Design a protein with these regions (language model features):
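N-terminal presequence-like segments and the immediate start of the first folded domain
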Residues: 1-75, 81-129
Length: 129
């Protein structure tokens, strides 16, 4: 069975030619999220890694919610940081608040050269229904 692609009403289109999420065999793959305001996508990004991490995770929660899922459905996360050495600890502090208790998905975190709109962080994930 081919994947199902989700374009979610009320959310801005992706900055790339992609869907908000794709689903196959009970797995939901979220397109990378960053710190833009989903209700005002042209607004400036928040300042600093803490604020951008909060917004990024809130965006993930919103996309998952539109699909009937929660953060507890997440099995795997990939985090991309443009200032890895500088921002890793601060990002982790915010991240840990969103994945408290038993919800501890597998995670990869890498440093990258650049992200869309000069974002400091981008996160994508795989969730399971």
């Amino acid at each position: 069975m081919p994947p199902k692609y989700h374009l979610i009403d009320g959310l801005p289109k992706s900055v790339s030619p992609s869907s908000h999420a794709a689903e196959a065999d009970g797995f939901v793959f979220l397109t990378g999220q960053f710190g833009r305001d989903l209700d005002n996508p042209d607004a400036p990004l928040p300042e600093g890694i803490e604020a951008q991490t909060e917004r990024t995770l809130a965006n993930m929660r919103r996309v998952l919610g539109a699909l009937g899922l929660t953060m507890e459905n997440i099995a795997s996360v990939r985090v991309f940081l443009t200032q890895f050495k500088r921002d890793y600890a601060a990002m982790n502090a915010v991240y840990a608040r969103h994945f408290a208790g038993a919800a501890r998905p597998a995670r990869t975190c890498v440093g990258v050269t650049d992200l869309v709109r000069d974002a400091l962080i981008e996160i994508d994930c795989v969730a399971k229904r």
